[in-house]
Regions:
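Glycine-rich phosphate-binding loops that contact phosphosugars or nucleotide phosphates
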Residues: 44-193
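Cofactor-/ligand-binding subdomain signature composed of acidic, glycine-rich
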Residues: 1-50, 163, 171-194
Length: 194
């Protein structure tokens, strides 16, 4: 595709940019078909030993979190809850569980999600941030950061960042499934519907 191709609107251009954004994002994490060792080292121990995960996000990022909920539960056997970031800050303090927390934000600066991250960090919970801005506040304050390389999005609806969030969450799931010794079990029990 020519870099000079014109599009009727920004969103259409960003849709066509998704394959390149995915390649750039996957290159951050993979060495051939394996998770890069530096990333594996960074992810080691991010999860809670009780196998509980909370995902806090808003908007399209929350939708990628809902997809991750299914992946992490089905393939890793983890107990996952997905919360609107704004609601977590209102009720999170009453939660006696201590789940590992994943925050997802395209900008890494979403105020409700940042407030949730700060709240759980103060309680000493393990945190992981997935953002499209590797120097964002969330990326810098979380215990582990998984940046995206989606590039700039000018259209309001998420396109490239949403697709890259899904890819990174899938890689995280595969890493956890392997770490937990569930890769064989996951593939044996997860059969496609006819």
């Amino acid at each position: 595709m020519s870099v000079f191709k014109s599009f009727a609107h920004e969103m259409l251009r960003e849709i066509y940019e998704q394959p390149a954004a995915l390649r750039r994002t996957l290159a951050l994490y993979l060495d051939g078909n394996r998770l890069r060792q530096d990333m594996a080292d960074q992810l080691a121990g991010w999860a809670n030993p009780a196998g509980e995960v909370l995902i806090a996000a808003s908007g399209s990022s929350r939708h990628s979190g809902l997809a991750a909920e299914i992946l992490l539960e089905d393939l890793c056997g983890l107990a996952v809850d997905v919360e609107y970031s704004s609601e977590y800050s209102c009720r999170g303090g009453s939660d006696s569980r201590r789940p590992a927390v994943i925050v997802i934000s395209q900008s890494g600066e979403t105020s409700d999600t940042l407030a949730a991250l700060r709240e759980v960090s103060q309680r000493g919970e393990k945190t992981l941030a997935i953002t499209n801005a590797d120097l964002s506040t969330m990326a810098l304050e979380a215990g582990v950061s998984m940046p995206l390389a989606a590039g700039v999005e000018k259209a309001i609806p998420a396109t490239k960042s949403f697709t890259c969030q899904l890819a990174v969450l899938f890689l995280l799931t595969l890493y956890e499934a392997k770490r937990l010794g569930r890769m064989g079990a996951a593939s044996a029990t997860h059969k496609p519907k006819p």
